[in-house]
A protein has these predicted regions:
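Phosphodiester-processing cores and adjacent nucleic acid-binding clamps
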Residues: 1-316
């Protein structure tokens, strides 16, 4: 597929995979393959309160059939219990990734948290915000003052940066909504970031995503009504299509690449680090291990032990 030279580069941020239970209609691998076909330079996975989907996307980058390998941004979409709108969180570096993991762990380990739940409030995010790139996403209908309050709180945190997401999903009032978002971003002095709020890699997956929504909402296709998406637009779109949609605000498309360039973290930076063992002064770790072993032998086998067992212990 040839991309015209005058089409600006575009990074799709905030992709939902099937690791967001009963929400995403495509596998992480599907997105990598589709991004390669579309020659998108960057894609950002952000599943609901989890980092689970990014591993399979990362592994797919090693598939030789993926010719044009996109840069993979590792993030999560935080869903809050205190009425805060969803926020996309992307760690800038390895240290920020660790803080995001700690934040998600806190949300899943509360005393009143059931399996599969994640209880987080805006205060929790602010506490772990250092080094994070934060993108506020808003529902179709939102209160401007409340959204501005959230943006202000995020800007006063230790985050690496704050953005406001903007999408055009053919819902009938896109132009008016985009105007509101543009004015809000100007008021808050944050950049507007284009996104298609992707739920599946190709429009053909829309029927599957509808079924997932019905299962989640415990309703039949006939009865679910407006809880389904109005169309099949929430797929991974080529840069040319996003540029056309945002032709009145091209900066929102350009901002996606500026956003992605600020992120240096990649999963290949993660390596297992064996924890330091407490060792008595003057002893090596091996010597201390041998001392503990022989102390255990005396505890479990008091007195003399036979030569065979002694030889086995020395070998081990």
């Amino acid at each position: 597929m040839n991309i015209p030279m005058n089409i600006p580069a575009y990074a799709e941020i905030g992709i939902t995979t099937n690791f967001s239970f009963l929400r995403g209609g495509s596998h992480p691998q599907d997105y990598v393959q589709q991004a390669s076909e579309l020659r998108l330079p960057v894609i950002g996975i952000a599943d609901h309160n989890t980092l689970a989907g990014v591993v399979r996307a990362y592994k797919e980058l090693g598939n030789p059939d993926v010719i044009h390998k996109p840069k993979l941004l590792i993030g999560s979409r935080l869903i809050f219990i205190d009425d805060t709108p969803d926020i996309l969180v992307y760690p800038r570096d390895r240290a920020a990734y660790g803080r995001l993991c700690q934040l998600l762990t806190r949300g899943k380990r509360g005393d009143d948290t059931e399996k599969g739940e994640c209880h987080l409030g805006l205060d929790d995010l602010v506490e772990f915000s250092e080094g994070q790139l934060l993108v506020l996403t808003l529902p179709h209908r939102f209160e401007t003052d409340k959204a501005l309050g959230v943006l202000d709180r995020l800007q006063r945190s230790r985050a690496e940066g704050v953005w406001l997401a903007a999408s055009l999903l053919y819902r009938g009032d896109d132009k008016r909504r985009l105007g509101r978002l543009h004015r809000m971003a100007a008021t808050a002095r944050v950049p507007l970031l284009a996104t298609n709020e992707v739920l599946y890699h190709h429009p053909a997956r829309r029927p599957l995503q509808d079924v997932l929504t019905c299962v989640r909402e415990k309703a039949t296709v006939d009865a679910i009504g407006k809880r389904l998406e109005a169309n099949a637009e929430r797929y991974l779109k080529p840069a040319a299509e996003m540029a056309r949609l945002f032709r009145e605000l091209p900066e929102a498309v350009a901002e996606t690449m500026r956003f992605s360039k600020r992120i240096t973290f990649s999963l290949d930076q993660l390596k297992y680090q064996y924890p330091d063992e407490p060792v008595p002064p003057g002893k090596t770790a091996q010597q201390h291990l041998e001392d503990l072993t022989w102390a255990g032998v005396q505890q479990h086998f008091p007195g003399e032990i036979d030569a065979t067992l002694r030889a086995t212990l020395r070998k081990e």
